[in-house]
């Protein structure tokens, strides 16, 4: 089994290996590994990597890698394939032979540095999975810096074609795309909303013709609201029509909120962003400490608990793993950690 790990500016490919016992770390000592070994690398043209998606296309494995914006020292690295300086965007790498990854294409992103540019997020769906997609096509959804979402036809990953763009935004981030339905929960910054990031729900079942369903966020974030603005969205995770839940995480490193939403009510309920309509699909909301965020809210549902195996009730639990993100280096903020919430009684989630 192969696993992919992205460092600040490289693609690192590992394979399972024999166990190596960790020793005391010493400057200049050889590298250590446990249950894996280094197979291959690619420097990604020295572009800082954020999110990878590894997709099986035909008889190949293709890595689609989102990048942060450039740095003060190198705002736009040179692309050796074109000979031109290009703002960081999306790297496309053939990793079928992990010992020899082949860089196929760089798609430039928004000009800018760090969080202000690049194309950080990428999702990929097969056309044969999407209800109205071309069954012979493969589609990539990505952010374009802070200003847009883009959909590309990547059937030939070396020659992507832009087919749709959702622009006019003030921010974007880590979206979620259901490949079986085409429903996309896009982390956006609608210009008239009071928060930097909220959710725009789109039907991307026909990727070339996006259809907007609604805007969504926490009451107090909507246009025309007054008072304090609730914590901005970081990202959602949907369980699809079968699970009928969307788990939203608000806050990156402070003021975190876990929100559990009825997916069907979100898609089919009243759309006007009034406080009542925004509350309508919500099942529960769990505020966290002001010191910690809810960067990722990952559902792990119907989990057996070995210690409870003989209990009459509660032998399995619905758990949400909540991951914070540290933003400031050298202890410049509160300690960011991983938390686990029991949402078995979903109207009363509790941290465990």
Name each model feature, range by range:
Residues 5-17:
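Bacterial N-terminal signal peptides
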């Amino acid at each position: 089994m192969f696993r992919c790990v992205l460092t600040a500016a490289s693609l690192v490919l590992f394979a399972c290996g024999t166990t190596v016992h960790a020793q005391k770390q010493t400057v200049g000592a050889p590298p250590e590994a446990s249950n894996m070994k280094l197979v291959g690398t690619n420097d990604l043209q020295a572009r800082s990597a954020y999110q990878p998606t590894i997709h099986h296309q035909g008889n190949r494995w293709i890595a689609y890698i989102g990048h942060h914006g450039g740095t003060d020292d190198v705002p736009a690295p040179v692309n050796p394939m074109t000979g031109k300086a290009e703002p960081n965007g999306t790297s496309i790498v053939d990793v079928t032979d992990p010992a020899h990854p082949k860089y196929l294409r760089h798609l430039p992103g928004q000009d800018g540095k760090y969080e202000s540019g690049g194309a950080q997020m990428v999702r990929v769906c097969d056309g044969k999975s999407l209800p109205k997609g071309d069954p012979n096509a493969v589609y990539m959804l990505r952010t374009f810096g802070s200003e847009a979402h883009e959909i590309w036809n990547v059937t030939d990953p070396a020659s992507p074609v832009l087919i749709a763009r959702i622009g006019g935004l003030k921010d974007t981030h880590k979206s979620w795309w259901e490949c079986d339905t085409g429903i996309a929960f896009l982390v956006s910054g609608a210009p008239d909303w009071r928060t930097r990031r909220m959710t725009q729900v789109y039907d991307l079942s026909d990727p070339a013709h996006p259809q907007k369903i609604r805007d969504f966020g926490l009451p107090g974030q909507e246009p025309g609201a007054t008072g304090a603005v609730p914590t901005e969205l970081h990202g959602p995770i949907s369980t699809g029509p079968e699970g009928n839940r969307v788990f939203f995480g608000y806050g990156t490193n402070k003021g975190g909120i876990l929100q559990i939403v009825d997916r069907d009510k979100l898609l089919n309920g009243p759309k006007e962003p009034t406080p009542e309509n925004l509350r309508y699909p919500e099942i529960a909301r769990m505020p966290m400490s002001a010191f910690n965020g809810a960067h990722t809210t990952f559902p792990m549902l119907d989990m057996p608990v070995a210690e409870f195996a003989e209990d009459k009730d509660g032998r399995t639990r619905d758990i949400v793993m909540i991951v914070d993100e540290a933003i400031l280096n050298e202890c410049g903020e509160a300690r960011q950690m991983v938390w686990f919430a029991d949402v078995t009684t979903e109207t009363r989630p509790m941290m465990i």
